[in-house]
Amino acid sequence: MKASPSIDAWLKEAKAHESAPLCGMYLTHNGTVRQTAKAKVRRGEDAPDVSGMYFTYDQAKVDAAVAETYKMDGIYYVRAWLNEGELTMGDDIMYVLIGGDIRPRVVDCLQYLVGRLKNECVVEKELN
């Protein structure tokens, strides 16, 4: 498990970045380990609660996903951090920060990037 970053520090860095004058909104995502199994939450299946998870990721795929977000209209700042190892309830899984010109574009970009990270870049194994 890695030490979680400071979102306050991330925002300070983003607002000092050369892209800051183009950004009218910054949006963050903080994914955490929850008690309810993914199968129960997403598919309504009867599944036991989890005590944690084993989490890993492919850095090259993460870098590619982040690079793709910069191709989206109005997106000027992107940062992502992913944890790794054995995580317990409430531990941080990931942080994502998106900076862009207007709310709809920033919201869409966050949805896009978190989806790509979760579906293409990470491996999660729930622990009981």
Give the ranges of each region predicted by the language model.
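N-terminal, polar/charged subdomain of small-to-medium soluble alpha/beta proteins
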Residues: 1-93, 99-128
